[in-house]
């Protein structure tokens, strides 16, 4: 009885401490935003332009600092500014909310600092109960295809007066682009079927057309600016999209087209058969598309080669299918080379690279992909992919964060909208998966095809990054889905230490090829969560810079963790383990002067996680052909910096108190002997003597100190 009372008391104490820490961390956004709003906006020195005088001399001309005039959305057509005063910036705002105190000054200084931009928008949030700032919408940089699907610009935008005047002639074009049919301002007819279109939406579209914002970029320079700061607090009753939300819609082709579908496949006859049959049955014969298919096989056994040939010969040539070409050659698996071989042996105007474990579900999917790929400014086009037999998302676009490229919304349910409609409609992303990737042959040739030095991983990402750097906008069509039987093509990389090592090596090649994209993704705000792939898209919730996290001291356990039990119920996710310099500056940073950094999450399945205290574990291992094994019982343990992880709570709604399951650990250079260390975790029950230990395949390399 006494033992139970003591345990109950300890449990309640642990939960109180947990709740107190959780309340502090979950209020971090409101606190962070209020701190920003108190800061003074730094003045920017106006740039100087030069004019050529009568005698050829250069005459300096300091650009004027503009005045900002705030205009409500309801009065956008009432501006009478025939001259287009160069010294004036118009800031258009929704009446449903308020600008921050800094907003006008931030906008003014932005235009001073960026003479190349004539139009800009920014981020916003919502005012909740008690005036608390909640639900921030951290928007992407200019995304033309996202904009045509939804008015993601939201509650405010600004432009130079001169551009407002010059864009007036684009009104009819803007209305047509947004789905309207009329040509009279302020009339119900002006928006046709899109009766909810806002006048401000039409005006913004006019400005974007004037700025050539629906054309291919010059490199990575964007034609419209984006201020990555919340400058507007929206009223809770106001829809952020003002009626034009991300939505499903049917698109028509610009003109009929030919498509070559390239499918790498080996020893998967039944899988490939399902894929081919689904393609034929869901591609309508009146879609304006004719297509051929190339199956590229790098080494199926004799029996499966026969099976391939038999069912390929039985696939009916209907609904636009002209032929299926089976290309066989025994060689090492190289996804890039197989894709390139397929492209060389086909002649379609467009190339669709498709995994053999893809199943097409509904008619119209190829038309939708092609309608985007036909746009001159669009590079690669992908589709939302769901896991089989359910609504779990496998892919909805790639985000490029500090730990590298990740799938957005992976393993989130598609039965509801996530983060302002990200899994709905059409979105510009920095990349899409090669499991389903459509591109024009000309653009494919322009970038030299797939990189054959990346044989297994990141080849599709490199392909998309190159397109982005060339100025194209990549697109993910999240208004429909295909099924992806992922991992049938090859084993999951996280299951084998050797595969993880290969994955890491190819990831380093990727970042060396694109050093300017380390932790840079114009379509995924730096204020959004950058943690594990199987999470929601949510605002970043820990605003403590990694530099401010203290270094952890090591406790040495010569004989291992005594009285502990190794148990798989202690789950560990290791999202980064490497040098702190690599984390901060990318894989090109070769030093280790700042020490080492590890981050991720861990939790105990089926238990109240508020009662557990966790410590990171490292043990020296020896690597061999079978992976890695411990060289002795010695274990090093480290206290962790507890991270707030609401994404884990969203994903694991059946688990108790998993909000604070994140961990971060910094280790000083020279603290550990050089070698390879396996990552693990210790979870100690604060209400009993229970100690749980588990290990993951992740290996941290400690380099010799120089």
Would you name each region that the model predicts?
Residues 101-134, 162, 221-222, 358-403:
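Conserved donor NDP-sugar-binding/catalytic core segment of glycosyltransferases
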Residues 61, 255, 543-706:
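Basic, ligand-binding patches in group-transfer machinery
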Residues 2-65, 237-260, 315, 389, ...:
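C-terminal, non-catalytic tails of nucleotide-sugar-dependent glycosyltransferases
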Residues 75-84, 329-346:
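Glycine-rich, basic loop-to-helix element that forms the pyrophosphate-binding segment
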Residues 96-97, 278, 295-308, 331, ...:
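A conserved acidic beta->alpha catalytic loop
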Residues 90, 351:
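Short aromatic/hydrophobic "clamp" motif used to bind/position activated sugar donors
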Residues 60-64, 113, 277-290:
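Short, acidic, metal-binding catalytic loop of nucleotide-sugar glycosyltransferases
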Residues 163, 176-222, 227, 366-369, ...:
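A short, conserved alpha-helix in the catalytic core of glycosyltransferases
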């Amino acid at each position: 009885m006494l033992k139970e009372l003591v345990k109950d008391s300890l449990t309640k104490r642990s939960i109180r401490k947990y709740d107190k820490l959780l309340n502090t961390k979950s209020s971090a956004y409101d606190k962070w935003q209020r701190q920003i709003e108190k800061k003074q906006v730094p003045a920017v020195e106006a740039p100087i332009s030069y004019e050529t005088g009568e005698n050829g001399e250069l005459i300096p001309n300091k650009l004027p600092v503009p005045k900002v005039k705030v205009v409500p959305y309801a009065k956008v057509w009432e501006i009478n500014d025939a001259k287009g005063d160069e010294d004036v910036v118009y800031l258009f705002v929704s009446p449903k909310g308020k600008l921050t105190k800094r907003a006008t000054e931030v906008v003014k200084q932005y235009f001073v600092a960026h003479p190349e931009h004539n139009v800009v928008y920014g981020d916003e949030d919502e005012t909740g109960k008690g005036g608390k700032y909640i639900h921030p919408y951290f928007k992407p940089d200019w995304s033309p295809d996202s904009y045509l699907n939804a008015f993601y610009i939201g509650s405010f935008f600004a432009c130079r007066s001169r551009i407002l005047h010059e864009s007036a002639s684009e009104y009819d074009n803007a209305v047509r682009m947004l789905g309207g049919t009329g040509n009279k301002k302020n009339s119900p007819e002006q928006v046709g079927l899109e009766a909810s279109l806002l006048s401000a939406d039409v005006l913004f579209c006019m400005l974007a057309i004037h700025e050539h914002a629906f054309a291919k970029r010059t490199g990575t320079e964007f034609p419209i600016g984006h201020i990555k700061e919340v400058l507007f607090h929206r009223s809770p009753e106001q829809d952020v999209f003002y009626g034009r939300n991300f939505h499903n819609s049917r698109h028509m082709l610009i003109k009929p087209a030919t498509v070559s579908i390239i499918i790498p496949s080996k020893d998967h006859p039944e899988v490939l058969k399902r894929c081919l049959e689904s393609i034929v049955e869901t591609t309508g014969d009146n879609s304006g598309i004719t297509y051929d298919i190339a199956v590229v096989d790098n080494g199926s056994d004799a029996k499966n080669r026969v099976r391939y040939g038999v069912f390929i010969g039985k696939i009916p040539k209907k609904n636009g299918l002209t032929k299926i070409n089976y290309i066989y050659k025994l060689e090492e698996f190289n996804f890039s080379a197989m894709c390139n071989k397929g492209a060389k042996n086909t002649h379609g105007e467009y190339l669709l690279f498709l995994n053999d474990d893809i199943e097409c579900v509904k008619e119209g999917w190829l038309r939708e992909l092609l309608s985007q790929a036909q746009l001159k400014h669009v590079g690669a086009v992908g589709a939302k992919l769901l896991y089989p037999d359910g609504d779990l998302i496998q892919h909805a676009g790639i985000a490029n964060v500090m730990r590298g490229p990740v799938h957005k919304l992976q393993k989130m349910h598609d039965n509801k909208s996530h983060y302002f409609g990200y899994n709905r409609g059409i979105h510009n992303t920095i990349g899409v998966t090669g499991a389903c990737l459509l591109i024009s042959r000309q653009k494919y040739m322009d970038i030299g095809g797939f990189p054959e030095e990346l044989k297994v991983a990141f080849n599709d990402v490199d392909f998309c990054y190159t397109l982005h750097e060339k100025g194209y906008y990549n697109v993910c069509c999240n208004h429909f889905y295909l099924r992806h039987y992922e991992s049938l093509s090859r084993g999951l990389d996280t299951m084998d230490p050797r595969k993880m090592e290969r994955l890491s090596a190819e990831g380093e090649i990727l970042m060396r090829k694109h050093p300017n994209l380390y932790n840079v993704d114009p379509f995924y705000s730096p204020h959004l969560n950058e943690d594990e792939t199987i999470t929601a898209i949510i605002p970043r919730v820990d605003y403590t810079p990694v530099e401010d996290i203290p270094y952890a001291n090591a406790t040495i356990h010569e004989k291992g963790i005594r009285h502990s039990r190794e148990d798989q119920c202690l789950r560990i996710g290791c999202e980064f383990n490497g040098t702190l310099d690599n984390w901060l500056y990318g894989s090109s940073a070769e030093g280790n002067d700042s020490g080492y950094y590890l981050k991720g999450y861990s939790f105990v399945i089926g238990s109240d996680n508020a009662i557990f205290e966790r410590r990171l574990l490292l043990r020296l291992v020896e690597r061999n052909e079978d992976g890695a094994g411990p060289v002795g019982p010695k274990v090093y343990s480290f206290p962790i910096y507890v991270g707030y992880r609401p994404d884990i709570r969203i994903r694991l709604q059946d688990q108790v108190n998993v909000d604070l399951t994140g961990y971060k650990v910094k280790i000083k250079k020279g603290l550990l002997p050089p070698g390879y260390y396996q990552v693990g975790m210790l979870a100690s029950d604060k209400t009993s003597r229970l100690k749980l230990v588990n290990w993951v395949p992740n290996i941290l390399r400690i380099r010799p100190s120089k």
